[in-house]
Swiss-Prot record:
Chain's gene name: glnS
The reaction(s) this protein catalyses: tRNA(Gln) + L-glutamine + ATP = L-glutaminyl-tRNA(Gln) + AMP + diphosphate
Source lineage: Bacteria, Pseudomonadati, Pseudomonadota, Gammaproteobacteria, Enterobacterales
Coiled coil regions, renumbered to chain: none
Places the protein is found: Cytoplasm
Name of the protein in its database record: Glutamine--tRNA ligase
């Protein structure tokens, strides 16, 4: 498949193709403009992949611009996190990082231009009165008593705002458009408000800050953006986007196009709700592996490639829909099945003693790092007469469908010997503490010589060589597909979204590094935790299971 054929197709790319073919544009210039007031989530990843992906495919440019117009909610911590997330996803912005605050002088000048044209006025209604005067979806708004001030008075009052002559909330600059417009966004929207707060880029130079709708379109124009891509909630705002650019002296007039935002099952995307999860300590922070944040997904073990693939699969449309969590999980499962080396770990261990194995001895068995990729090599794993197996891999009695170890029957130990369960020891409560077996010494990685069939295979870890590991079994954060629809979304948090186990891993896991995934054979995909793991304490996070257990549960 050629590069052109491999490109995704969607309505935005069709618009770009038409613009280039008609000569409307000779190049493509997009931007990703996050507000630095929180951590990016999987929904932002869709926008990142769209904007940067288009720039890559059309040999154009994509700017990273921070929409930093509200100093009260913003922080340099979020700036650094967002930069890191964009780079981790595999994208690079054009030129230097931009900030909307870079344009504060020009934005102020354009506001003055609107005042001079009689298209903006200083309003002294309270914020509550402004909301009251705005009207509703079914009732028109009404004009502010301050709407018809003269140009000279508005210029003087706007300067008074700029120099700190008003208290916060006592005055604002509004566009003079139409209070009877069927679109509420066009009912004299606020362009500037007063905030006495230090800005992370401009310090205390300003005490008036432009609103998003005023800033966004002008920043796009100043940067020469050709296609301004937003999610559907900004569809009505396009009217204000165009109104501002139509009424100021600026040579470039970008066009805004809207696409559906990403809604994902079993999670929430609302910044307010995510913040509540963090502040009320329902999760351990913004990078908690159960969170839909990019930092949380990364810590859980998701790869950048899997997130890019997910964004490619869901596509770009104008219809809002909710994507199944299984779709995201299948992307990382396919990625790691193809690329993750294998290792053995026992999550719920029970001791198994091979009574006829030479006491005190051990040997090395060779195991492939990947069953289908010889180029990934092999490793030597120690084997001895005392091993750990998973408790679920043994039953005293079982039906024919159970293909693991059963009392009096045989099973194969992965890449090692055939063993037979002979007896067990139990504690006072009746729990099995030790399984005693015998082994066939002539079955190391080969079938029994007499031709008997041994169907089951289980994994194991040599007890004498095992590494104690903590295993964090992460699952979906909520127990229902649409937690946002619940009366109290916190009431449907999945109580088993994190289960912590103490188990054992093979010695090769000592070399594990954060961000590098393994398939724990027969268990799932895991990675070393970047927060809790130390040289003396190995902590592994489950990224995803080997199969979709939620689909099975719902059948």
């Amino acid at each position: 498949m050629s590069e052109a054929e491999a490109r995704p197709t969607n309505f935005i790319r069709q618009i770009i193709d038409e613009d280039l073919a008609s000569g409307k544009h000779t190049t493509v210039h997009t931007r990703f403009p996050p507000e630095p007031n929180g951590y990016l989530h999987i929904g932002h990843a869709k926008s990142i992949c769209l904007n940067f992906g288009i720039a890559q495919d059309y040999q154009g440019q994509c700017n990273l611009r921070f929409d930093d117009t509200n100093p009260v909610k913003e922080d340099i911590e979020y700036v650094d996190s967002i930069k890191n997330d964009v780079e981790w996803l595999g994208f690079h912005w054009s030129g230097d990082i931009r900030y909307s605050s870079d344009y504060f002088d020009q934005l102020h000048a354009y506001a003055v231009e609107l005042i001079n044209k009689g298209l903006a006025y200083v309003d002294e209604l309270t914020p509550e009165q402004i909301r009251e005067y705005r009207g509703t979806l079914t009732a028109p708004g009404k004009n502010s008593p301050f709407r018809d001030r003269s140009v000279e008075e508005n210029l003087a009052l706007f300067e008074k705002m700029r120099t700190g002559g008003f208290e916060e909330g006592k005055a604002c600059l509004r566009a003079k458009i139409d209070m009877a417009s069927p679109f509420i966004v066009m009912r004299d929207p606020v362009l500037y408000r007063i905030k006495f707060a230090e800005h992370h880029q401009t310090g205390n130079k300003w005490c008036i800050y432009p609103m998003y709708d005023f800033t966004h379109c002008i920043s796009d124009a100043l940067e020469g953006i050709t296609h301004s891509l937003c999610t559907l909630e900004f569809q009505d705002n396009r009217r204000l986007y165009d109104w501002v650019l139509d009424n100021i002296t600026i040579p470039v007039h970008p066009r805004q196009y809207e696409f559906s935002r990403l809604n994902l099952e079993y999670t929430v995307m609302s910044k307010r709700k995510l913040n509540l999860l963090v502040t009320d300590k329902h999760v351990e922070g913004w990078d908690d592996p159960r969170m839909p944040t990019i930092s949380g997904l990364r810590r859980r073990g998701y790869t950048a490639a899997s997130i890019r693939e997910f964004c490619k699969r869901i596509g770009v449309t104008k219809q809002d829909n909710t994507i199944e969590m299984a779709s995201l999980e299948s992307c990382i499962r396919e990625d790691l099945n193809e690329n993750a080396p294998r290792a053995m770990a026992v999550i719920d261990p029970v001791k198994l003693v091979i009574e006829n194995y030479p006491q005190g001895e051990s040997e090395m068995v060779t195991m492939p790092n990947h069953p289908n990729k010889l180029e990934m090599g092999s490793r030597e794993v120690p084997f001895s007469g005392e091993i750990w197996i998973d408790r679920a891999d043994f039953r005293e009695e079982a039906n024919k469908q159970y293909k693991r170890l059963v009392m009096g029957k045989e099973v194969r130990l992965r890449n090692a010997y055939v063993i037979k369960a002979e007896r067990v020891e139990k504690d006072a409560e009746g729990n099995i503490t030790t399984i005693f077996c015998t082994y066939d010494a002539d079955t190391l990685s080969k079938d029994p010589a007499d031709g008997r069939k041994v169907k089951g295979v289980i994994h194991w870890v040599s007890a004498a060589h095992a590494l104690p590991i903590e295993i964090r079994l992460y699952d979906r954060l909520f127990s229902v597909p649409n937690p946002g629809a619940a009366e109290d979304f916190l009431s449907v948090i999945n109580p088993e979204s994190l289960v912590i186990k103490q188990g054992y891993g093979e010695p090769s896991l000592k070399a594990a590094v954060a961000g590098k995934a393994f398939q724990f054979e027969r268990e799932g995909y895991f990675c070393l935790d970047s927060r809790y793991a130390t040289a003396d304490k190995l902590v592994f996070n489950r990224t995803v299971g080997l199969r979709d257990t939620w689909a099975k549960a719902g059948e």
